[in-house]
């Protein structure tokens, strides 16, 4: 089982992640992605879904038109782990490739 990050490690990881922040009231990180339109937002979600499935680590997310709101936390560990940081990095790379 993967271990939950310490507060210091989580803060350090967030410094390296663009646009991500701690979610108030939860041991989780979050970010909103905004795309040109719904098709691009859905394409992003599709690409992330393939990565998430391969890693067996899935985001909490919602999509409204061209915005995708993401929350990452590892339920089995009760908070943010390296799995969340790695998925956040992958999401950032996918979003950047679509810009």
Curated annotation (Swiss-Prot):
| The family this protein is said to belong to | Belongs to the pterin-4-alpha-carbinolamine dehydratase family.
Transmembrane stretches in the record are none
Q: Which reaction does it catalyse?
A: (4aS,6R)-4a-hydroxy-L-erythro-5,6,7,8-tetrahydrobiopterin = (6R)-L-erythro-6,7-dihydrobiopterin + H2O
This entry's Enzyme Commission designation comes to 4.2.1.96
List, in alphabetical order, the Gene Ontology terms for molecular function in this entry: 4-alpha-hydroxytetrahydrobiopterin dehydratase activity
Q: Which GO terms describe its biological process?
A: tetrahydrobiopterin biosynthetic process
Q: Which HAMAP family match?
A: Pterin_4_alpha
Q: Which UniProt keywords apply?
A: Lyase
Record-linked CDD domains: PCD_DCoH_subfamily_b
Name of the featured protein: Putative pterin-4-alpha-carbinolamine dehydratase
Keyword Lyase in record: yes
InterPro entries given in the database record? PCD_sf, Pterin_deHydtase
């Amino acid at each position: 089982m993967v271990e939950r990050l310490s507060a210091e490690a989580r803060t350090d990881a967030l410094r390296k992640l663009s646009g991500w922040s701690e979610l108030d009231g939860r041991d989780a990180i979050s970010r909103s992605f905004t795309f040109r339109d719904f098709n691009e937002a859905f394409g992003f979600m599709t690409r992330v879904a393939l990565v998430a499935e391969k890693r067996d680590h899935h985001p909490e997310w919602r999509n409204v038109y061209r915005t995708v709101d993401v929350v990452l936390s590892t339920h089995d560990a009760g908070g943010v782990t390296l799995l969340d940081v790695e998925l956040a990095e992958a999401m950032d790379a996918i979003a950047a490739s679509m810009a």
